[in-house]
Each structure stands twice: as C-alpha cells, then as structure tokens.
Amino acid sequence: MQITRIPTTDPAEMDGPVQESTALLREGVSTEYEDKTVRSSEVTFRPGERTKFHTHEGVQVLYVTEGTGVVATREEEQDVSEGDLILFSPGEEHWHGNTDDADA
C-alpha cells in the first residue's frame, strides 16, 4: 500500500497546449509506482470550456465530482455527470470539457 498526502492549494488558471480555454487547475501529486509515474490533478472546467484533442503516454483516468461534461474521441462523444469514471487508453486521441450549464 502506498499513501500520498495531497497538499491543499488554491486553484489557478491553466493555459497549456491542449487547452481551448483557461480551466482552473488544482495541482495534485506526482509519484512513482512500479516504475511508472502517476500524476493526479483536480481540474474545473467552467461553462463551455474544453481541451483540444490530445493523447497521453499512459492511461488517463477522469472522475467527475460534480456537474456535467462531455468526453470524446474521434469516433464518439458522450455526456458524463457526477460519479462517472472515464478511462482513456494510452495514445487514444480524445478531448474532455464542460457543457454550457455550470462548472464541472
């Protein structure tokens, strides 16, 4: 078992190469597990915000803690809401973001 304490930080606007907008990012942790780097962050997408199509070297796990959103690949688009867990495979081109209703 490995436990990592996540520091409490204030969210800050992020503006990276995969962003269509400036979502709010609360940095989480980056740790090593079985020779792999595992990262976590809390991201809040304001109404209408989303990422551009992008990929990751490893699996990306999204967990919707509140609100509604949209996740998409080149082949499909799905609505998601509080309690949904989404997995993207390594190299799978995708985007994710919010609907136009409220923060998510």
Model-derived features with residue positions:
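Short, conserved beta-strand element in jelly-roll/cupin
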Residues: 42-46, 55-73
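A short hydrophobic beta-strand segment most commonly corresponding to one strand
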Residues: 40, 61, 87-88, 101-104
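Asparagine-centered strand-capping/turn motif at beta-strand->loop junctions
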Residues: 97-99
